[in-house]
Amino acid sequence: MDEYDELYVYTMGRKNFILQHVVDAHIAQSAAAANPPAIGVIFALVGLYLHVEKGFTGTQVQNAHRVMAKKKRSWPDVVWPTERGDMTPATVLAIPGGQARDQAIDAWCKEVWSAFSANRSMVASLIDEYEIG
């Protein structure tokens, strides 16, 4: 089991479905740069935006993803950053389990979202289009 899988298992059943934030940060940080992007990348960026900027819980992010999945469309291109943050699942796992590790997950999300900040207006437009938030 690699560090991502271990962190994934750790978050299963944690309060507010923080597993969703782990999935979103990991997808955005590790996806191959390609345009048009895979739907998972768009959903990950939307999830990070909603969590970091709007304070959405993992459950609320998952519900937003459900709304977006109902309408098929082509997705806008992503501006791919050269660096996507220094934190990784291994960094997060180095923090003792519990509230401190959960806060480290939030810090990881913030770092990855910051790396993708050139996509903020595109993501905000999608949020408006789907009337989320």
Each language-model region and where it sits:
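Intrinsically disordered, low-complexity linkers and terminal regions
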Residues: 2-133
